[in-house]
Amino acid sequence: MADAAVIEKLEAGFKKLEAATDCKSLLKKYLSKAVFDQLKEKKTSLGATLLDVIQSGVENLDSGVGIYAPDAEAYTLFSPLFDPIIEDYHVGFKQTDKHPNKDFGDVNTFVNVDPEGKYVISTRVRCGRSMEGYPFNPCLTEAQYKEMEAKVSSTLSSLEGELKGTYYPLTGMSKEVQQKLIDDHFLFKEGDRFLQAANACRYWPAGRGIYHNDNKTFLVWVNEEDHLRIISMQMGGDLGQVFRRLTSAVNEIEKRIPFSHHDRLGFLTFCPTNLGTTVRASVHIKLPKLAANREKLEEVAGKYNLQVRGTRGEHTEAEGGIYDISNKRRMGLTEFQAVKEMQDGILELIKMEKEM
């Protein structure tokens, strides 16, 4: 059971949320007094409490979602709060639904969406994974961070062929290596205020690192927001090549490292927005004519469940008319379906741009 000091902090946090009339987070929407009272004394076997789940959203009242899972068990123990938030965010994934088993499908279905190279600047597909038997960031010890890093770096160093590369630990990284990784846009920084408030950045930079292959088309982030972020990317629009590279990497890593998986929710991640397939397939794309008609762009994107962001990701503007467009859905469909939906949408957007 959670101790008195934690419960006191929780009570204060709940009062703060209640008083914040302009707060629009899903946490505020679904943390009723009844749910709060039901969960405030609970504790996972690794010692995580409701405070670990909600503290980022309490501190940052402008959060969109406002909760994180401190460990895998939290998704079950605190399900009266997680489930409605998951259903709301992953539109259409009801509390009775079950996420399908992993299925990359026939990877040869995927093509170069822009063979002429006129519109798509680059293509990227990523997924997140958590290592079984370890909690998520807020509950990890420094020793666990280092142990996980050792397991992951030895697994990655055994990769061959196109995936063969080098692991760069953040600890003790030289200025030259650091600058090189910044220039390649590979380096991740210590978490933003949302992650900081969730206690996701403790013992930084212990156990954190970056692996990339020699061609710089395959990248793994170790212990950033998630235990593993596996990323495949390249210039141009060859989604087929990018997706095939990602799937072969995931399959290789999976042989050596068991991943956290939930019967109903799919692959588990620190943030509930990434659950399920955890897959985000995106392009940086120039659509000058459609961009001039943002409503039309959003309408078509909506039809294919695509998310339109600015060039530098969330909360940014489109620089030089270049957008970051990706699949929105992660849950209740397979990896294959998620990427196929994105491919269909991008092909449709390019077709419209040509016809305008």
From Swiss-Prot:
List, in alphabetical order, the Gene Ontology terms for molecular function in this entry: arginine kinase activity; ATP binding; creatine kinase activity
What the entry lists under CDD domains is as follows:
arginine_kinase_like
Limits of the Phosphagen kinase C-terminal domain: 119-356
Q: Which residues carry this modification: N-acetylalanine?
A: 2
Q: What is its EC number?
A: 2.7.3.3
Q: Does the keyword Transferase apply?
A: yes
* Residues holding L-arginine: 64-68, 225, 271, 314
The first-level EC class reads transferase
Taxonomically, the superkingdom here is Eukaryota
Q: Which InterPro entries match?
A: ATP-guanido_PTrfase, ATP-guanido_PTrfase_AS, ATP-guanido_PTrfase_cat, ATP-guanido_PTrfase_N, ATP-guanido_PTrfase_N_sf, Gln_synth/guanido_kin_cat_dom
**Keywords, A to Z?**
Acetylation, Allergen, ATP-binding, Kinase, Nucleotide-binding, Transferase
GO CC: one term?
A: extracellular space
Short name of any one Pfam family annotated for the protein:
ATP-gua_Ptrans
Q: Which residues bind ATP?
A: 122-126, 185, 229, 280-284, 309-314
Instruction: List residues of the Phosphagen kinase N-terminal domain.
Output: 9-91
Reaction equation(s) it catalyzes: L-arginine + ATP = N(omega)-phospho-L-arginine + ADP + H(+)
Q: Name one GO biological process term.
A: phosphorylation
In which family does this protein belong, per the annotation? Answer: Belongs to the ATP:guanido phosphotransferase family.
Q: What is this protein called?
A: Arginine kinase
Its source organism is Penaeus monodon
The organism's lineage is: Eukaryota, Metazoa, Ecdysozoa, Arthropoda, Crustacea
